[in-house]
């Protein structure tokens, strides 16, 4: 498996299919009105069976093409292929893509005054000096709008284990040998391992999101040692395998995406918990970008309507309800309380509270699928896989 292929996107396609079907590329709903925007996005951007509710809310027509899991494909298509002609807007494949696209002149700088919901963004994103400011900026200029975010953590089966956990340590503890799993992707797995090793004092790692070569080697060798000792039941690939591992009881704890935990808990009818790890988590957001060519074609008005809708509590609460993802925006609790007939308000407020607890952990590290030493990450991850 190519390491740059970010596995979350495999889940995005699979989850959308189970939640109502993935539309064929380039669909334009007949009943939609307003300006048309050609959108190339991950299916997770649509928390509805069709785009029609979003189109009605935004006042636009969406001609949608589902986006694949490959970051390599996205870079190739938008930088040297026909992507700029085919699409007006597109989503990313993980942290750092906005830098590559802006640097190569693919995407347009954004005018935030054209989005009335821009001020709903949390300070850590909106403030140029905020912790997450980099995730939507290039050279201090804004090029992207976030639509979902999370802090990935550890899921554990409290029904089986009989207690709560607030540390990554049990994932590497021989007590649970053969009953734990991690993701088959160097990004999240090496990042959370680096967070644990650094915060527990076992290694000194300056930047857990962008490690130096010797740090990459140290983290990989730790994983190799654990793997050779039989610590891991497996390294999971894709949403369905993750759900099956947890729901079946084949593993009792696993690093994973929050929707995997939510679906597995329901499938197993057990108390499978998504914890808050005291060492930290991999934090991320996904973004939508406007191509420069689309701005020249006059599609920018439709883009700002799309982006503004993504920032609205109407959209973010529906993302939370359907997929368990939140947003780096405010106003969700007020919206939930104002629309109790549309949501399980108590459950979603509890989910948001747990997210806030994870966001607040000092040791968190931001997702980065384009680290400076990418080749070293790839080479050492290959050794982990082969061990």
Listing of model-derived features with the role each one plays in the protein:
Residues 1-19:
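N-terminal secretory signal peptides and thylakoid transit peptides that target proteins
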Residues 33-100:
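Early extracytoplasmic/lumenal segment of secretory-pathway proteins
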Residues 49-50, 178-189, 309-334:
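Periplasmic-binding protein-like
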Residues 72, 94-241:
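Extracytoplasmic ligand-binding site segments that recognize negatively charged/polar headgroups
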Residues 74-86, 100-104, 170, 240-250, ...:
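Short helices/loops that flank or line small-molecule/ion binding pockets
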Residues 154-160, 196, 285-299, 318-319:
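A bilobed periplasmic-binding-protein/Venus flytrap-type ligand-binding module shared by bacterial periplasmic
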Residues 231-296, 341-347:
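Extracytoplasmic/periplasmic substrate-binding proteins
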Residues 317-387:
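C-terminal capping/gating helix-and-loop segments adjacent to ligand/active sites or protein-protein/ligand interfaces
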């Amino acid at each position: 498996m190519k390491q740059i292929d970010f596995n979350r996107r495999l889940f995005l396609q699979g989850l959308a299919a189970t939640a109502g079907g993935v539309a064929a590329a380039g669909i334009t709903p007949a009943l939609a009105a307003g300006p048309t925007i050609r959108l190339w996005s991950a299916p997770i951007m649509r928390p509805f069976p069709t785009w029609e509710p979003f189109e009605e809310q935004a006042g636009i027509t969406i001609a949608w093409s589902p986006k694949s899991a490959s970051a390599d494909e996205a870079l190739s298509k938008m930088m040297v292929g026909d992507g700029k002609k085919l699409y007006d807007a597109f989503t990313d494949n993980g942290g750092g893509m906005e830098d590559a696209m802006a640097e190569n002149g693919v995407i347009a700088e954004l005018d935030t005054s054209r989005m009335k919901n821009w001020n709903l963004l949390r300070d850590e994103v909106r403030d140029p000096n905020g912790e997450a400011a980099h995730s939507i900026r290039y050279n201090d200029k804004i090029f992207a709008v976030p639509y979902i975010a999370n802090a990935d953590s550890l899921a554990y089966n409290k029904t089986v284990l009989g207690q709560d956990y607030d540390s990554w340590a049990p994932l590497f503890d021989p007590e649970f040998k053969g009953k734990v799993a991690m993701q088959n992707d160097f990004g999240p797995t090496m990042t959370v391992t680096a967070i644990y090793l650094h915060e527990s004092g076992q290694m000194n790692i300056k930047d857990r999101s962008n490690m130096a070569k010797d740090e990459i080697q140290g983290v990989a060798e730790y994983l190799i040692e654990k793997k050779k000792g039989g610590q891991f039941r497996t390294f999971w690939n894709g949403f369905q395998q993750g759900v099956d591992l947890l729901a079946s009881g084949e593993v009792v704890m696993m690093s994973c995406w929050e929707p995997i935990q939510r679906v597995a808990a329901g499938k197993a009818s057990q108390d499978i918990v998504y914890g808050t790890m005291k060492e930290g988590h991999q934090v991320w957001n996904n973004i939508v970008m406007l191509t420069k060519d689309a701005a020249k074609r006059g599609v920018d008005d439709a883009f700002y309507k799309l982006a503004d809708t993504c920032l609205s509590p109407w959209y973010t609460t529906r993302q939370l309800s359907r997929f368990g993802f939140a947003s780096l925006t405010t106003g969700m609790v007020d919206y939930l309380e104002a629309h109790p007939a549309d949501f399980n308000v108590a459950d979603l407020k509890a989910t948001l509270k747990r997210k806030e607890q994870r966001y607040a952990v000092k040791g968190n590290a931001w997702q980065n699928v384009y680290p400076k030493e990418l080749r070293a990450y790839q080479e050492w991850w290959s050794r982990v896989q082969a061990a």
